[in-house]
Amino acid sequence: MVQVVSQENFADSIASGLVLIDFFAEWCGPCKMLTPVLEALAAELPHVTILKVDIDSSPRPAEQYSVSSIPTLILFKDGKEVERSVGLKDKDSLIKLISKHQ
C-alpha cells in the first residue's frame, strides 16, 4: 500500500534504499488517476518504497525539490534524487525508470 508522508518525516522516508515519491494534491485529476498505477507498482516491486507527499498539507519537500507541476514523481536512491518524471505515467514506464537504478 502506498502511504502519504508529511514534511516532518520526509527526510527519514527517503534516507535509504530506492524510494519513489509522488508529489500530488487531492484536487488534481491526473494525480487521482496515478494512484492505482502506483498501487499496482508497489505490489509488483516490493523492494521499492512508494510514498506520496500532499503538496498542500506538506509544501516544504515540494519547494525543496522545485516541484512546479503535479503529479511529479521523484526516485531517490539512498537519499539522493536519481530520476524525475512529470505527468501521468503508466506502470511499464515507471518500471523502466526504476529498473535503471536497482
UniProtKB/Swiss-Prot annotation:
GO terms assigned for molecular function: protein-disulfide reductase activity
Cellular component, GO annotation: cytoplasm; cytosol
Occurrences of domain Thioredoxin (ranges): 1-102
Record PROSITE patterns: THIOREDOXIN_1, THIOREDOXIN_2
Organism: Chlamydia trachomatis serovar D (strain ATCC VR-885 / DSM 19411 / UW-3/Cx)
Keyword Transport carried by entry: yes
Disulphide-bridged cysteine pairs: 28-31
NCBIfam families listed in its UniProt record: thioredoxin
Gene3D superfamilies, per database record: Glutaredoxin (3.40.30.10)
The protein, known as: Thioredoxin
Function according to Swiss-Prot or TrEMBL: Participates in various redox reactions through the reversible oxidation of its active center dithiol to a disulfide and catalyzes dithiol-disulfide exchange reactions.
Annotated family: Belongs to the thioredoxin family.
GO BP term, pick one: cell redox homeostasis
Pfam families attached to this UniProt entry: Thioredoxin
Keywords in alphabetical order: Disulfide bond, Electron transport, Redox-active center, Transport
